[in-house]
């Protein structure tokens, strides 16, 4: 399983905005991701809330390659708690 740990400034606890999500994907994920197997995307513990706009922007590049079904089957989300993880997955 490929593991990708996202990085944000320590003071950043909430993520929002479609363009910001796209930027994070392009800068931290796009050049290293391989869709050949399962992928674990790890949000740092300081992240408390992730808006649907960020989720949609971040995952738009992934969905374009493997589709929503591929995201459901291949992508595992790890965050500070199960509620946040469920929220991120729901907002894809």
Predicted regions: what they are:
Residues 1-13:
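Domain-start "cap" segments at the beginnings of catalytic or binding domains
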Residues 11-28, 34-37, 43-89:
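Amphipathic alpha-helical interaction surfaces in cytosolic regulatory modules
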